[in-house]
């Protein structure tokens, strides 16, 4: 990795016509990258349609492409870099509790108990696993994943509608910009038996699995800086207040969709005798505009 400056490096392309890889991180971080991670980054850069690749400081070897890398591909979809934990993301909820409230042991215990009563955790766990879990169910789950946070879905889940305004993907549409495409796709998967154990998987929405999923209550501290205060106001954060940070994904529901896409595209590559980028079967892709790409976009 060549040095660009104190916080950035450059992994030169192995040959002409292939983009190099931007590496974000101090010199110590850049020295710590696994050789397999760097090889995967260069392999991804040489794949069809890829125009840019960036390695973040936490990048490590993944499914054909490094986990923690960012790639731009305007014409091709790559399931490998996306991964299999769909909607794996962070959310932050500002509570109306002041920070000093948690100094009281009883309040701490009540907060922990309230969270545990409502939040299923662990492999295979779903909404029926906790006493006060939100009953997702088959019909409501279908609407949630094909419509997003509509007024009807919010009412059914007991979620304030105004929360939808702060959600980055409050509404869902398919490859053609319609909800109907999503409904047709999910109906097709169910009717053809390509979504086994759907009922149990849909009930896992709104829960934590194993791995690195977590929920964490913290005290918000806004530093004495105008930009920091503006940012806090934008996100509705209260200095000295308690906020709940959550990291989770779509559990078994999203995992099935993602792994099924891997298998479908790998079968398509084998049937059509298409060359794998770098010989790596995890780097199968779908050119935009093809039925394979449309199905992937609808699934995800």
List the model feature ranges, each with a label:
Residues 235-245:
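Glycine-rich, flexible loop segments associated with nucleotide phosphate handling
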Residues 1-52, 76, 80-81, 86-232, ...:
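Glycine-rich, flexible loop motifs
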Residues 48-56, 60-63:
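N-terminal low-complexity or amphipathic/hydrophobic leaders
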Residues 59-87:
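Active-site cofactor/substrate anionic-group-binding motifs, chiefly glycine-
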Residues 61-62, 89, 249-254:
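Short acidic, Gly/Ser-rich segments with clustered Asp/Glu that frequently serve as metal-coordination loops
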Residues 71, 234-235:
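Conserved ATP phosphate-binding architecture of protein kinases
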Residues 54-56, 243-247:
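Short glycine-rich or small-residue beta-strand-to-loop segments that form or flank ligand, phosphate
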Residues 58-60, 218-221, 248-250:
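Short, flexible loop/turn elements at secondary-structure junctions
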């Amino acid at each position: 990795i060549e040095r660009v400056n104190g916080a950035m490096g450059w992994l030169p392309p192995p040959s002409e016509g292939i983009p190099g890889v931007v590496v974000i991180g101090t010199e110590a971080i850049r020295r710590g990258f696994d050789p397999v991670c760097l090889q995967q980054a260069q392999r991804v850069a040489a794949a069809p349609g890829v125009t840019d690749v960036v390695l973040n400081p936490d990048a490590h070897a993944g499914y054909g492409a490094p986990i923690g890398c960012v790639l731009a591909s305007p014409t091709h979809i790559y399931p490998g870099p996306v991964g299999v934990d769909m909607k794996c993301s962070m959310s932050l909820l500002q509570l109306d509790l002041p920070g000093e409230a948690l100094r009281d042991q009883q309040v701490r215990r009540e907060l922990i108990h309230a969270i545990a009563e409502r939040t299923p955790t662990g492999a295979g766990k779903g909404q029926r696993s906790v006493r006060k879990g939100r009953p997702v169910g088959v019909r409501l789950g279908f609407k949630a994943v094909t419509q997003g946070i509509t007024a009807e879905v919010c009412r059914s889940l007991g979620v304030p509608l105004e929360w939808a305004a702060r959600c980055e993907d409050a509404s869902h549409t398919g490859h053609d910009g319609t909800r109907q495409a999503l409904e047709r796709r999910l109906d097709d998967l169910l009717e053809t038996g390509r979504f086994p154990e759907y009922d149990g998987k849909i009930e896992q929405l709104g829960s934590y699995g194993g791995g690195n999923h977590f929920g964490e209550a913290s005290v918000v501290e806004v530093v004495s800086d105008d930009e920091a205060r503006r940012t806090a106001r934008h996100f509705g954060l209260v200095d000295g207040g308690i906020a709940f940070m959550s990291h989770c994904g779509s559990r078994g529901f999203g995992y099935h969709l993602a792994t099924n896409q891997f298998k479908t595209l790998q079968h398509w590559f084998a049937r059509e005798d298409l060359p794998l980028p770098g010989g790596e079967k995890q780097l199968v892709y779908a050119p935009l505009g093809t039925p394979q790409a449309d199905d992937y976009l609808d699934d995800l």
